Amino acid sequence: MKMNERFWDNLEIILAEKDLTWAELARKVFNGQYVYPSEFNRLYQKLRHYKSNRLMPQTRWVERIVLVLDIDYEDLFKR
């Protein structure tokens, strides 16, 4: 399994364990980066694009995900 696929599979499991939706994750990750709903929607759609195409997100997104979910970086790539 490729690292990017493992990342998305593990993130999906972690979100389920924390009872969070993808939209809630996006709100936490992009907090402070948008004012209007259209700006949030653009960021959320970008996250969905990465997820649906199983692309590895930008390093700063990964770091932010680790921070807002209060998890270890390794949790996203092992399991």
Language-model-detected regions and their locations in the chain:
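Pre-recognition alpha-helix immediately N-terminal to the DNA-recognition helix
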Residues: 9-10, 46, 64
